[in-house]
Amino acid sequence: MATPTRALSQKEQDIQMMLAAEVHLGTKNCNFQMERYVFKRRNDGIYIINLGKTWEKLQLAARVIVAIENPKDIIVQSARPYGQRAVLKFAQYTGAHAIAGRHTPGTFTNQLQTSFSEPRLLILTDPRTDHQPIKEAALGNIPTIAFCDTDSPMRYVDIGIPANNKGKHSIGCLFWLLARMVLQMRRTIAPGHKWDVMVDLFFYREPEEPKEQEGDEVVAAPDYGITDYQATALGGLGGGDWGAPITDAPQWGADVPAVAPIPAVPGSNWGDAAPMPSAVPIATDGWDAAAAPPVAVPPPVVEGVPPPAGWE
């Protein structure tokens, strides 16, 4: 007689989900402060993270988040593109403030900035990528929760959740689990009940996917109801014989009256030039006739002053 299958607990279901999302895969390097969370090392050098400790750290982080009265005092930040959608979804369901993208230096330390804020808790995706907000949070005594891989630096990190923080499925799964735990502790979701929000909403999506789907659709050619392509079209023009002469076309030059030519002036020549008052004879027989020199103007005559002789 086969024994009935035992129903999995909530922790076992979460661990199976994290296995499917490859949360347990680390890197080939291991920080000395992350050795306590490593389960084993594979033959190819990849460190395997203990998902049991990951689940416990998620519970600890959820308790810290629930302990803050105003959710707007919590900042969830991710500079990594794979975590930006998950950060926005986490803030949507938990009420926290999300910062998706590059961190503006001085957000937590420079009071002259318009984006200055003093949060009570900071949640990050990667301590290596988000190193600037971690340093500023340390200067402002802000507790920090971060998802740490096996090679992540643990400096200034108060609660490090060991997990794969480089995969888009891993990051989405972690934020989904953390959001569900927070809602369960707030009694928004009844304990033991399934959350109706799918984990796929927290996954990163490629922005080119909708464009590719639109390009695959074949646009049908419009049907104008023409069945006989040899039929007469365009107001009587032959559809099949385009080279035939068109006899019915109006003659555009028939209605235009002929213009009589302008009569030439008798005895005139194009090369003739007007007579110039000059003593130098100028040849005016052809097209290469030279231009007339300027006319000399006599100097004014002043009484009592002799005219210039030209040597002055």
From Swiss-Prot:
Which SUPFAM superfamilies does this chain map to?
A: Ribosomal protein S2 (SSF52313)
User: What HAMAP family does this protein's entry cite?
Assistant: Ribosomal_S2_euk
Q: What does this protein do?
A: Required for the assembly and/or stability of the 40S ribosomal subunit. Required for the processing of the 20S rRNA-precursor to mature 18S rRNA in a late step of the maturation of 40S ribosomal subunits.
CDD domains found in the cross-reference section? RPS2
Which key words are in the record? Cytoplasm, Ribonucleoprotein, Ribosomal protein
What the entry lists under InterPro entries is as follows:
Ribosomal_uS2, Ribosomal_uS2_CS, Ribosomal_uS2_euk, Ribosomal_uS2_euk/arc, Ribosomal_uS2_flav_dom_sf
Q: Which Pfam families match?
A: Ribosomal_S2
Assembly, in brief, is:
Component of the small ribosomal subunit. Mature ribosomes consist of a small (40S) and a large (60S) subunit. The 40S subunit contains about 33 different proteins and 1 molecule of RNA (18S). The 60S subunit contains about 49 different proteins and 3 molecules of RNA (25S, 5.8S and 5S). Interacts with ribosomal protein S21.
Q: Give the UniProt family note.
A: Belongs to the universal ribosomal protein uS2 family.
Spell out the molecular function terms from Gene Ontology. structural constituent of ribosome
Could you tell me what this protein is called? Answer: Small ribosomal subunit protein uS2
Q: Where in the cell is it found?
A: Cytoplasm
Q: Which organism is it from?
A: Vitis vinifera (Grape)
Is this entry keyworded Aminoacyl-tRNA synthetase? no
Name any Gene Ontology BP term.
ribosomal small subunit assembly
Annotated GO CC locations: cytosolic small ribosomal subunit
